[in-house]
């Protein structure tokens, strides 16, 4: 299955993005839009990339041809994908994890996607916290080995307990500790400021101390998961810190826009650029 050369997907930061890279998690866009329309919206808002779930696993050959052509025409990159959900602390799910990864890799390679998003998902009730941590570390080492030859990373995303009461990893503090134990360049942390604010707060200090382990950041305000400025998180300060730290990976907008999506997403992108550039001049 190959419709376009992989070299087509080398999207760099757009000139108007001042060297920064921005993406949109597609599930946050109106459900009435087709995949192609979602891509057009992302491009119209000035974004470099998009993040997908598992929708590409259901594409027909004709879907692949059409969607890859649209990505190529718009110069968009698929920066991350979500290959599945398995309890990383549960060794009985190891085969399911392997199957998810093996099934996801061909499509990810076709899309030029180099990063998978995983949550630790559900706790194993009979495990102690120490056993749970050890099991997650072991599973991520296993996953890193599986992905080595394909050059794909995993970013571990903590989920707050308000969203998922049985979540095994709920804070970036623990996620950073886990990735250090895994000690693989293939395993990093997805710092989702929305989840971390709901769970623990203290967003900037943890970012400052652990920037080398951050593989991706997600943006949404609290409460409501809407655009920055609608809630309590001071994203201006967060963006300035990202600028000070010379963060050069994707900044993904994972919020439900209030208002016209293109207008709102463009404004969010420009706000981030302005704040980061203010400390880099």
Q: What are these model-predicted stretches?
A:
Residues 2-23, 28, 32-43, 113, ...:
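Histidine-acidic metal/acid-base catalytic patches
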Residues 28-30, 54-56, 84-87, 122-124, ...:
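Active-site-proximal loop/turn and secondary-structure-junction residues that shape catalytic pockets
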Residues 51, 80-82, 117, 155, ...:
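Conserved beta-strand positions in the central sheet of alpha/beta enzyme cores
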Residues 51-74, 120-128, 163, 223-226:
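Glycine-rich, proline-tolerant flexible connector loops at the mouths of alpha/beta enzymes
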């Amino acid at each position: 299955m190959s419709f376009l050369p992989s070299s087509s997907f080398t999207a760099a930061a757009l000139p108007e993005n001042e060297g920064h890279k921005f993406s949109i998690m597609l599930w946050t866009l109106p459900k009435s839009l087709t995949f192609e329309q979602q891509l057009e919206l992302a491009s119209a808002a000035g974004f470099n990339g998009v993040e997908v779930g598992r929708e590409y696993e259901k594409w027909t050959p004709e879907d692949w041809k059409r969607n890859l052509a649209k990505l190529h025409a718009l110069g968009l990159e698929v920066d991350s994908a979500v290959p599945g959900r398995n309890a990383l602390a549960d060794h009985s799910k190891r085969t399911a994890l392997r199957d998810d990864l093996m099934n996801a890799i061909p499509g990810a390679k076709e899309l030029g996607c180099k990063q998978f998003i995983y949550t630790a998902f559900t706790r194993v009730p009979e495990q102690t916290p120490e056993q749970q941590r050890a099991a997650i570390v072991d599973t991520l080492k296993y996953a890193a080995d599986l992905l080595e030859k394909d050059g794909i990373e995993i970013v571990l995303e903590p989920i707050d307990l308000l969203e998922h009461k049985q979540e095994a990893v709920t804070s970036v503090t623990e996620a950073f500790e886990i990735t250090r134990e895994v000690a693989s360049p293939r395993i990093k942390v997805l710092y989702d400021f929305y989840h971390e604010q709901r769970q623990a707060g203290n967003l900037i200090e943890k970012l400052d101390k652990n920037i080398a382990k951050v593989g991706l950041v997600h943006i949404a305000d609290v409460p409501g998961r809407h655009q920055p400025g609608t809630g309590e998180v001071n994203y201006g300060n967060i963006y300035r810190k990202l600028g000070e730290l010379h963060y050069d990976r994707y900044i993904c907008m994972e919020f439900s826009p209030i208002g016209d999506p293109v207008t709102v997403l463009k404004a969010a992108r420009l706000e981030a650029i302005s704040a980061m550039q203010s400390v880099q001049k």
